Amino acid sequence: MTTPRPIYIGCDPAFRAGGFWAAILDMEDKTIRFMSFDLLSWHDFLRSADAPPSCFICVENSNLQNKSFDMTGTKAEIARKGRNVGCNQAVSELAYRSAVLQYGARNVFQVSPKEKGVKITDTRVFFGIMKQEGILLPPGATNQDQRDAAKLALICQRKALLEGRFKADKVPQIRYNPAP
């Protein structure tokens, strides 16, 4: 029996007018597609017929870092930035919890912004990484949020494989008999 190739979803939640992006990496055909969500549509998608019945998800959870990044500006600007950070932390935590409720803690990872690492700002570098991984991108340009989500999907793949959460096909055991 062959185990179907896994699906990895990278989710970079944010609280903003345009919502946030998720990258869905399907290892069956090595394609990636991008979908835009707000928190409620993310929750609904995970429970819909359009969502994969089984997958691994990696959510960037800024709540893990619990830090305001930019403390420059007037008191009012700092307060506004603090509220924005708080909103993003709440959305991140709820997006993570929603995924865990649907797929279970074993299939859902969370990483802090620090653990996610630097952004891939150069599209040529991004396309090079995808080519190196053998992943087919949809036609057209990508934005920074899509590239971040794709990076999270790749992190998800590594974490699932390294932590042994994906059950690969059993390799038949070969017994060596040295006797003639």
Residue ranges and their predicted role:
Residues 2-180:
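Phosphate- and other anionic-substrate recognition elements at nucleic-acid/protein interfaces
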